[in-house]
Amino acid sequence: MARLKDYYQNEVVAKLKSELNLDNIMEVPAIKKITLNMGVGDAAKDKKIMTFALNDLTAIAGQKPVVTMSKKSIAGFKIRDGWPIGAKVTLRGERMYEFLDRLITIAIPRIRDFRGLSAKSFDGRGNYSLGMKEQISFPEIDYDKIDSIRGLDISITTTAKNDDQGRALLKAFGFPFKS
């Protein structure tokens, strides 16, 4: 069992139930899924760039990503309908908790000039999104083998009813928010 899943079931649930004054244990917020998204606009010019991005995302997530295609042609961006422009991965279950563990303990502390996560990135329903400017923060990515530095978006979807519950859940997991 993943370390954070065990920690959630044994400690976080009881702590949040009393902290949020919830009656039922099923009301305690939980993380449903984590979505990783990497936009690769340069892939329209060179197909190799997309391959490198897919390899990076596969190494980070431990799961094969899905290539996202453009929905319509945009002349200003020089892309056509149906061209590959990004990749995404949705993590659930054990892999989600393993990724969350690596994100909190290894990747976030390795971010340059890090002063804490913004508490304003909640969407109003308890879900949290953050962007990373460099994929090299993850230990799976070898700096010598990458072609360029790419960022990625991380969306954490929770069962929380509002931002306060979502913030309490992520703080219980050890997310370093700005105070």
UniProtKB/Swiss-Prot annotation:
Example of a GO cellular component annotation carried by this entry: ribonucleoprotein complex
Xref: SUPFAM superfamilies: RL5-like (SSF55282)
One Gene Ontology MF term: structural constituent of ribosome
Pfam families with a match to the protein in the record: Ribosomal_L5 (PF00281), Ribosomal_L5_C (PF00673)
Gene3D superfamilies (alphabetical): 3.30.1440.10
Biological process (GO), any one: translation
Subunit structure: Part of the 50S ribosomal subunit; part of the 5S rRNA/L5/L18/L25 subcomplex. Contacts the 5S rRNA and the P site tRNA. Forms a bridge to the 30S subunit in the 70S ribosome.
Function: This is one of the proteins that bind and probably mediate the attachment of the 5S RNA into the large ribosomal subunit, where it forms part of the central protuberance. In the 70S ribosome it contacts protein S13 of the 30S subunit (bridge B1b), connecting the 2 subunits; this bridge is implicated in subunit movement. Contacts the P site tRNA; the 5S rRNA and some of its associated proteins might help stabilize positioning of ribosome-bound tRNAs.
Matches recorded under PANTHER family: 60S RIBOSOMAL PROTEIN L11-RELATED
Protein name: Large ribosomal subunit protein uL5
Native source species: Francisella philomiragia subsp. philomiragia (strain ATCC 25017 / CCUG 19701 / FSC 153 / O#319-036)
Gene designation: rplE
